[in-house]
Swiss-Prot record:
InterPro entries: FA_synthesis, Phospholipid_synth_PlsX-like. This is Phosphate acyltransferase. HAMAP family: PlsX. It comes from Clostridium botulinum (strain 657 / Type Ba4). Pfam families: FA_synthesis. One of its GO terms (biological process) is phospholipid biosynthetic process. Homodimer. Probably interacts with PlsY. It catalyses: a fatty acyl-[ACP] + phosphate = an acyl phosphate + holo-[ACP]. It comes from the Bacteria. Its main location: cytoplasm.
């Protein structure tokens, strides 16, 4: 399997991108990586780490898409950018997956306009995995589509279901519709229409779910439009980050707290690991005609290595074909 990696995307590119790629080719069999970006910079990083293998190559790209550029314009105008070059490798069949920690908006535009959508899929959705009290959960969509139709949400649910079953090995994952209340009649026109459609599918649909219940692990796939999803995601990340800061501050405020903190250090370490985004790799753009993984902007080497593992599993489990097959079932049932 060949994986295209945007070597210039993210806060720590190209250093930690290269480090993650080296770790991946050493750990995972059957992968070859093409790093796109400024050849001299990437080669220097490989040389610094004394990499002498033949599983990593460089494709030169002189331009870089920054996070403050208009996404669609950047994708269309910067043809020699590391992100576009990586996407084009997948489009041309020269790679089977693309990974980038660069601009989310630009990668979304690239997944849509360079890779294209799977036939019959209305919108590509961003579907991050997050740690929950019982097990990881997915938000679909987490920001790619601010305005949605009810049928889009059904497709998001289907693609999330495929990901859980194929990639994570979870049979019959639960699907919940994010809403302001659990009752069927709650919500706006979109959620009411989506509820009716989801109820008619063969998904393990548990009904409406309030945002507060998502981290409790009450649902595997939380379905919503991108505006709601991104708000839930950012709130969750903010609360998790501040919780650790507040806890540390309270522990260090007294001698008793310091002693208790020292005794509980292994517990805190395990607890913090559960909230470590690097464990999950990245967020897949589901619905694109190619495997496309968005790594976190602040990804370290471990996160890149795990994103590469994630891409490999998606490829091995034939996730694109599985989405196509499941989409056919929806169409047959007029949903």
């Amino acid at each position: 399997m060949i994986i295209a990696v945007d070597g210039m995307g993210g806060d720590f590119a190209p250093e930690l991108v290269v480090e993650g790629c080296i770790q991946a080719v050493k750990e995972y069999e059957g992968i070859h990586i093409i790093i796109t970006g400024k050849k001299e910079l990437i080669k220097n990083e490989l040389d610094k780490r004394e990499y002498k293998g033949n599983k990593i190559e460089i494709l030169n790209a002189e331009e870089v898409i920054s996070t403050n550029e208009a996404p669609v314009k950047a994708i269309r105008r910067k043809k020699d950018s590391s992100m576009v070059k990586a996407l084009e490798l997948v489009k041309e069949g020269k790679a089977q997956a693309v990974i980038s920690a660069g601009s989310t908006g630009a990668l979304m535009a690239g997944a849509t306009f360079v890779l294209g959508r799977i036939k019959g899929i209305n919108r590509v959705c961003l579907a991050p995995l997050l740690p929950g009290a019982k097990a990881p959960f997915m938000i679909a969509d987490a920001g790619a589509n601010v305005d949605c139709k009810a049928e889009y949400l059904v497709q998001f649910a289907m693609m999330g279901k495929v990901y859980f079953e194929s990639v994570l090995g979870v049979k019959s994952p639960t699907v919940g519709l994010v809403n302001i209340g659990a009752e069927e009649e709650k919500g706006n026109e979109l959620t009411k229409a989506a509820y009716k459609l989801l109820k008619d599918t063969d998904f393990n649909f548990i009904g409406n779910i309030e945002p507060r219940d998502i981290p409790r692990g009450e649902v595997n796939i939380a379905v919503c439009d991108g505006f709601i999803g991104n708000t839930v995601l950012k709130t969750y990340e903010g609360v998790a980050s501040n919780l650790f800061s507040m806890l540390k501050k309270e522990i260090m405020a007294s001698t008793r707290g310091k002693i208790g903190g020292a005794l509980l250090k292994p517990v805190f370490k395990d607890f913090k690991k559960k909230f470590d985004y690097t464990e999950y790799g990245g967020s897949p753009f589901l619905g694109a005609k190619g495997i496309c993984i968005k790594a976190h902007g602040s990804s370290d080497a471990k996160a890149f290595k795990n994103a590469i593992r994630q891409a490999k599993i998606c490829y091995d489990k034939k996730i694109i074909e599985e989405i196509e097959n499941n989409l056919g079932n929806l169409i047959e049932n007029n949903i």
